[in-house]
Amino acid sequence: MNQYILAIDQGTTSSRAILFNQKGEIVHMAQKEFTQYFPQPGWVEHNANEIWGSVLAVIASVLSEAQVKPEQVAAIGITNQRETTVVWEKDTGNPIYNAIVWQSRQTAGICDELKAKGYDPLFREKTGLLIDAYFSGTKVKWILDHVEGARERAERGELLFGTIDTWLIWKLSGGRAHVTDYSNASRTLMFNIHTLEWDDELLDILGVPKAMLPEVRPSSEVYAKTAPYHFFGVEVPIAGAAGDQQAALFGQACFTEGMAKNTYGTGCFMLMNTGEKAVASKHGLLTTIAWGIDGKVEYALEGSIFVAGSAIQWLRDGLRMIKTAADSEAYAEKVESTDGVYVVPAFVGLGTPYWDSEVRGAVFGLTRGTTKEHFIRATLESLAYQTKDVLAAMEADSGISLTTLRVDGGAVKNNFLMQFQSDLLAVPVERPVVNETTALGAAYLAGLAVGYWNSRDDIAAQWQLERRFEPKMDDDKRTMLYDGWKKAVRAAMAFK
């Protein structure tokens, strides 16, 4: 009987279950969306029980549709939307409040208070992160502040905190394992990435009792087995976990220092492996843990771009310039250039390296001769310019010059964008055969832990190139275009 690895990819808008075989190929996939709650402007919440239900549903679907028996699953790997925060009762397993999602800004006030007290350098030094509503720590504080009696119950050990990986492992194991992995812990604002422990000083500042925190474990090891009543009567090892962007770095086989990947989803996330060094950023990047395996931790630099694929959705749904996202490529290729037009898609502010949440979207360089094609091309090009901003920061911080960029995510199907990205960065861009690199990374982490794959070398050998884009632009043109982008960003930031 063939054995498979089951990856659970729990995302922001949907949960997916993907079966992989020993060659790292997708056997079958199932997906289910769930409800987004917006109780107030800027707030985003999920129902943690609904997420759990969606995960059970996709597991059942993928096994039945692929005609794979539960006992053919060698191990389960979990990857997840990072930072999203759940607090639940230890005895009943019931959440005491909705999950507060990574995008949610409801703790911005708490962050402002912490920054006003001068805590930013302390948090940055210990966690590699900025004080921002994006990360879990202030979300836990918010729940403990707003749910009556919660902090006292947490101190008594009656409540548990977890990011989504922790919640799913706890549920799948029937409450036998309250654990997280190093990569997810490093996104909480409560974990010291140098000592590799929950940090008492930071917990005191946030008012979060240590008793509610999960045990931090390697990203590739058996945490527990599935409770038979949740997995069709079978106990399967839950053997790997990593946050979605770190899992994608692993799935792209970026195992050596200086290798990098960029994921083009709703936003863009670029990670560079910095090996066993936690590189402190002077250019607006986050220092984060890539994964912990075989008794050692490896680090990464991360750049976050808030608007990428969502800019193409805006062309389709907001401006109705295109019928499908794929149409953007054909329109962009009808013109030789944008004719001097720049789109700065700062719909929710700008991320790395600017970290300006007040700036809004802007368009520059319009003339009477500007057409729809120019506008669409300029919007696509903005994804590549933002990526160049991030890469410039990475190279400055790490002292490493990138030799190739591996890419994944929905927008990488756009050949125009990938070619322009290569031209602008002056490095080759490599698109893999398997684009589901996040789930693949989780599968690899779980499979390594149970001997389904033997080593990272085996995994690196499986990585297959679908297409390589080589830079074709001359240096003068590249410099001229990028100077124009920087001018456009400065102008957008001045208009507030």
Swiss-Prot record:
Any GO MF annotation of the entry: ATP binding
Annotated GO CC locations: cytosol
UniProt key word rRNA-binding: no
Modification note: The phosphoenolpyruvate-dependent sugar phosphotransferase system (PTS), including enzyme I, and histidine-containing protein (HPr) are required for the phosphorylation, which leads to the activation of the enzyme.
InterPro entries referenced in this protein's UniProt entry, alphabetically: ATPase_NBD, Carb_kinase_FGGY, Carb_kinase_FGGY_CS, FGGY_C, FGGY_N, Glycerol_kin
Domain of life: Bacteria
Gene3D superfamilies in the record: 3.30.420.40
Protein residues bound to ATP: T12, T13, S14, T266, G309, Q313, G410
UniProt keyword ATP-binding, yes or no: yes
Enzyme class: transferase
GO biological process, one term: glycerol-3-phosphate metabolic process
Pfam families: FGGY_C (PF02782), FGGY_N (PF00370)
Quaternary data: Homotetramer and homodimer (in equilibrium).
Family: Belongs to the FGGY kinase family.
Protein name: Glycerol kinase
Originating species: Geobacillus kaustophilus (strain HTA426)
High-level lineage: Bacteria, Bacillati, Bacillota, Bacilli, Bacillales
